[in-house]
Amino acid sequence: FGHAGEQTLGKLLPLGFHHADQSLRVVEKLEYDGKGLNLTFEVRDGIQRHSKGRGDILDEDAEDMPATLEGQIVRVSDVIAYVNHDIDDALRAGIIREEDVPAGLVKVLGKWHATRIDRMVMDVVEASLAGGLERIAMSDRIMRAVVELREFLYQNVYFNSAARDELRKTEKIIGDLFAYVMERPEEYVKPYPAGDPAVVRAGDFIAGMTDRYAMALYERVFLPKSWPIL
């Protein structure tokens, strides 16, 4: 359930929840029946630092900046992908209208999906080359526009009334499933990593669900079955 699911798990788990940290946990502690994958530092660093929420996208002084150019490319690609797809999804869903998008952003980034992506990607290439490829960069003009577009999405899409309604539904589904699993961990929770409390391993189980699986399990566990008509 996207950000809503992440927020809900963050409230349920004693140490909170962030999808990037959970991704690292999966490859280090959960894969291969708890043995983990033998990944290099560079790959693990890129996984853990690929996401930045509302923080700096490519601040060279930021403590959470990926250590490698490849990791920095993943980080900026993540932003380019989700701001473009989310703005289009919000338009198609009727959450916002084209005229709601600030004219200044349209002027800098373009009106159409392909135009925006092309402009952002080419700017990253040109700014990074201009800096001698010491780090992945964006020009100040495009960076300001991307940050403004991201903030527009937070204010008008992610935190709008429809999103809050979906959050309440998500909290209900995930919260009920989490409580159900905690009552019978032997049925759902894996026995590894050894030493991790059941509540953390229950979080692993919930976090590993797809939306469809979670809704199907919720229906099977909590909703009554229809009676056949004789």
Model-derived features: where do they sit?
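Histidine-centered, transition-metal-coordinating active-site segments
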Residues: F17, D21, V26-G34, N38-L230
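Aspartate-rich (DDxxD/NDxxD/DxxxD) Mg2+/diphosphate-binding motifs
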Residues: F1-A20
